[in-house]
From Swiss-Prot:
One Pfam family recorded for the sequence: SecD-TM1
Protein family: Belongs to the MzrA family.
Protein name per its UniProtKB record: Modulator protein MzrA
GO molecular function: protein kinase binding
Annotated keywords: Cell inner membrane, Cell membrane, Membrane, Transmembrane, Transmembrane helix
Function, as annotated: Modulates the activity of the EnvZ/OmpR two-component regulatory system, probably by directly modulating EnvZ enzymatic activity and increasing stability of phosphorylated OmpR.
Residue intervals passing through the bilayer: 10-32
Location relative to the cell: Cell inner membrane
Gene3D superfamilies in alphabetical order: 3.30.70.260
Length: 127
């Protein structure tokens, strides 16, 4: 029994196909992971933060799903699977909470955005 001989052309096509498949999978996983975060902060220092249960109640009543609600420093962070869910939650929470709160979307979870914002913030130090 003889094994077929692999030519250089076949090896090149096979290697190219494997590399292309790998790049496609890498790009797909990067685009698929698009978490979005809402941050709720009080404008005035004396204003108390809303508790996570009330936020959960309002989002659940409007059919908006979220991944987590986490207090961090003086901010309440709400993580969503997509920017669309985050935008819908922002509309609901803007209606729900009084004007003493800032509700802002934070979609800069990837490292490229963090590096760009770091470079933008520190550009005045050069020269």
């Amino acid at each position: 029994m003889q094994l077929p001989r692999v030519t250089l052309r076949q090896m090149t096509w096979t290697t190219s196909a494997i590399v292309l498949l790998g790049i496609t999978l890498l790009l797909w996983s990067a685009f698929r992971h698009q978490e979005s975060t809402l941050a709720i902060r009080a404008i005035n220092q004396g204003t108390t933060m809303p508790d996570g249960f009330s936020v959960w109640h309002h989002l659940d009543a409007n059919g908006i799903r979220f991944k987590s609600i986490t207090p961090k420093n003086d901010t309440l962070l709400i993580t969503f699977d997509s920017s669309a869910q985050s935008a819908a939650a922002k509309v609901v929470l803007d209606r729900t909470f009084p004007h003493g709160y800032i509700i802002a979307q934070q979609d800069e979870d990837n490292q490229a955005s963090q590096w760009l914002s770091l470079l933008r913030d520190t550009s005045h130090r050069f020269g």
